[in-house]
Design a protein with these regions (language model features):
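Catalytic-core regions of hydrolytic enzymes
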Residues: 37
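N-terminal beta1-alpha1 ligand-phosphate binding loop
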Residues: 3-26
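FMN-binding flavodoxin-like domain, especially the glycine-rich phosphate-binding loop
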Residues: 2, 26-34, 47-52, 58-172
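Short amphipathic alpha-helix with an adjacent loop that forms part of the alpha/beta core around
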Residues: 40-46
Length: 172
């Protein structure tokens, strides 16, 4: 199993799964993709290299991904994720820095890839009803910007994910 690479995803909208499937096409000797919630310490102990697909939440990886990575030590990680806004923003740079730090703390990060992902607009629209100034409030202006996330990750972003994972894997 030393050469086998598990592909693990965390998702609410399906973005993480789409990235994981794309990654699988670039990893010849893989197992998965597997839902992150089924990954036990026994699974972690069996493998050396992992591809982990996450979604962004509050400027970093989602809670399930943070939990999984914090349980890993001495592993080689390829971390790929989706973000609801454009990846050429200050927020995206912050997400990258936070996820890279998380993945590098106790493991070797072979590479990180981030692309845009669709936002569940039904979920976020409810936040427009939270009064301005209160935690979680979403302005209508920001909600309108979130609509630009629909259709992501697109074919070009999935192709880029495949290429990135193949490149990162060559470092293992």
């Amino acid at each position: 199993l030393a050469d086998t690479v598990p592909i693990i995803f965390s998702t609410i909208t399906g973005n993480g799964y789409k990235l994981a499937v794309a990654a699988a096409e670039a990893v010849p000797n893989h197992v998965g993709p597997y839902n992150i919630r089924y990954i036990t310490d026994e699974v972690i102990d069996k493998f050396d290299t992992f591809v982990i697909s996450y979604w962004c939440n509050h400027g970093t990886a989602d809670d399930d991904t943070i939990d999984l990575i914090s349980r890993m030590h001495g592993k080689k990680l390829i971390v790929i994720g989706t973000l609801g806004v454009s990846v050429d923003t200050a927020h995206a740079a912050k997400v990258c820095a936070n996820v890279i730090a998380l993945a590098s703390e106790h493991n070797t990060l072979l590479g990180h890839y981030l692309c845009r992902g669709s936002i569940d607009l039904k979920r976020t629209f409810a936040r427009t009803r939270i009064p301005e100034g209160q935690k979680g409030h979403l302005s209508m202006e920001r909600f309108e910007k979130q609509k630009q996330s629909l259709g992501h990750p697109n074919a070009e972003e999935l192709d880029a994910a495949r290429a990135a994972v193949a490149e990162f894997l060559s470092k293992a």
